[in-house]
A protein has these predicted regions:
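Pro/Ala/Gly-rich low-complexity, hydrophilic intrinsically disordered segments
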Residues: 180, 185, 192-212
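Acidic/charged, solvent-exposed loop-and-adjacent secondary-structure segments enriched in E/D, K/R, S/T
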Residues: 88-110
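N-terminal mature ectodomain segment of secretory-pathway/periplasmic proteins
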Residues: 20-92, 120-158, 162-168
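Short, solvent-exposed recognition patches
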Residues: 204-290, 303-307
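Bacterial N-terminal signal peptides that target proteins for export
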Residues: 1-7
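Surface-exposed amphipathic alpha-helical segments
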Residues: 162, 169, 173-192, 296-318
Length: 318
């Protein structure tokens, strides 16, 4: 009898592990579908008490993927993706600035390309079923293992694995940012003119021919003070335009979900330590360390960013 009970417990444990692995596979597929699934739809973006509406179309496969999102309210702007290239378009400079800000969070592609290390800092749990844009979806909650990060909730359509709704919540359970499809068809437009820009003023956010950031000889030799789980992905050093003697070191860290950029540049004037919200869940913190101005940008809570910028210790290579 005891052996039978023990066998039953073991089988239950194996089943639970298999179910957990299946859930992580769903999230991995959701990260791919969020960038590659052909679609035509409309979505809402809610943050900081404001609401924006965008129309999005996407078609093609692999390097030929094209995507265009157009604002339906607020400043007129377009964000167009062709393969790896990402460009903002607008009728005037003010609207172009708004387009650059909107491009910080390109729903439904909220998850990073590679989520291989995500389980170190987050747990995954199914939290029920829902219906979004007349489609069934399953809630997948990525809960941080500490209070320094946001909770990310995704409602994933079970056939395509496309996230139909994404909510970012703080430790108190309040929604910091929310994206929701109101209309969605899982096919792209047949007419290629749907991907053409309407406006002439543009700004290239990411060039298809841009060199990839790698760990180089000028990267900092040591960075401490990051929350657990963050690893250095890549680093680069650049000179400022027209100021060859002034260089900026840029490093990108990730915990498998959050992408965190660290900028180090020579300090030229006194700036107070501060943390500010840039856009939705994206915050920025700055502080002076010796002769350098240090800036952090990422989708972490403002208190976390401020604590990090205070505790960050950077040792530069000679």
């Amino acid at each position: 009898m005891r052996l039978t009970q023990l066998s039953g417990v073991c089988l239950m444990g194996v089943a639970m592990l298999a179910h957990a692995d299946d859930d992580w596979l769903v999230v991995k597929r959701a990260a791919v579908a969020a960038r590659q699934q052909p679609l035509t739809g409309t979505y809402l973006h809610q943050m900081n008490g404001s609401l924006e509406t965008f129309r999005i179309v996407r078609g093609g496969t692999g390097d030929t993927i094209q995507e265009k999102r157009t604002s339906l309210d607020g400043p007129s702007r377009e964000i167009i993706r062709k393969g790896l290239e990402l460009t903002c378009y607008a009728p005037d400079a003010k609207s172009l600035s708004a387009a650059k800000i909107s491009a910080m969070r390109l729903f439904p592609a909220i998850l990073p390309d590679d989520i291989g290390n995500i389980a170190q800092s987050y747990t995954l749990k199914r939290s029920g079923k829902d219906r979004v844009a007349q489609r069934d979806c399953n809630w997948m909650d990525l809960k941080p293992r500490d209070s320094k990060r946001y909770l990310l909730r995704l409602c994933v359509e079970p056939v395509s694995n496309l996230p139909l709704k994404v909510i970012t919540q703080n430790a108190a359970g309040d929604a910091v940012e929310q994206f929701t499809f109101t209309e969605i068809e899982l096919q792209g437009p047949k007419d290629k003119s749907a991907f053409r820009p309407q406006y002439k003023q543009n700004y290239v956010l990411r060039s298809a021919n841009a060199p990839q950031m790698t760990l180089d000889a000028d990267a900092p030799s040591e960075v401490s003070g990051m929350p657990s789980g963050f690893k250095l992905l890549r680093a680069v050093q650049r000179s400022l335009p027209g100021q060859a003697e002034r260089t900026i070191r840029h490093m990108v860290f990730s915990d498998g979900l959050v992408m965190l950029s660290l900028f180090i540049e020579p300090q030229t004037d006194g700036r107070a330590e501060r943390a500010v919200n840039l856009h939705g869940a994206v915050n920025m913190a700055t502080a002076v360390q010796g002769d350098y101005l240090v800036t952090l940008v990422g989708d972490l809570p403002e208190p976390t960013m401020l604590a990090m910028i205070r505790n960050l210790k950077i040792t530069l290579k000679p």
